[in-house]
Amino acid sequence: MADTKTATPATDAEEATATPPAAAPSSEAYAIVEASGTQMWVQANRYYDVDRLHAEVDETIKLENVLMVKDSKGTTLGQPFVKDATVALKVMAHRRGPKVIVYKMRPKKKTRRKNGHRQELTRVMVESITVGGKAIS
């Protein structure tokens, strides 16, 4: 006969201190910014691809259109933007996105048109997120 183990119920103190394994750490600071006409969730020391920016490689750009900031103190929501909040981006490279095929056809006619498109992108690294002159990450 196989050994069977019975689970012991957790106490209230154990349940309060236990965290689920898939939960992200709450100390991670992030911001939601508006860049190139889109809203992006950004974190420090990560890179993102945005629509082409008019900036040279290794140039630093400051985004002031910060919609929301989350840090260890809490969440700050802008109406529409967070006051005195900036995100510093460093341009890593200019590149092109994957090719998208556009195919137009009229049925029962000999009209067919095939075009390809590659979006011009800029890869940026988030250097810092600052609120009120203090870097939160």
UniProtKB/Swiss-Prot annotation:
GO cellular component: cytoplasm; ribonucleoprotein complex; ribosome
Keyword RNA-binding part of the UniProt annotation: yes
InterPro entries, per database record: bL21-like, bL21-like_sf, Ribosomal_bL21, Ribosomal_bL21_CS
Gene Ontology biological process terms from the UniProt entry: translation
Coiled-coil annotated residue ranges, if any: none
Cell membrane keyword on record: no
SUPFAM superfamilies membership: L21p-like (SSF141091)
Key words, A-Z: Ribonucleoprotein, Ribosomal protein, RNA-binding, rRNA-binding
GO MF annotation terms: rRNA binding; structural constituent of ribosome
Disordered, as annotated region: 1-26
Physiological role: This protein binds to 23S rRNA in the presence of protein L20.
Subunit description: Part of the 50S ribosomal subunit. Contacts protein L20.
Family indicated by similarity: Belongs to the bacterial ribosomal protein bL21 family.
Protein name (Swiss-Prot/TrEMBL): Large ribosomal subunit protein bL21
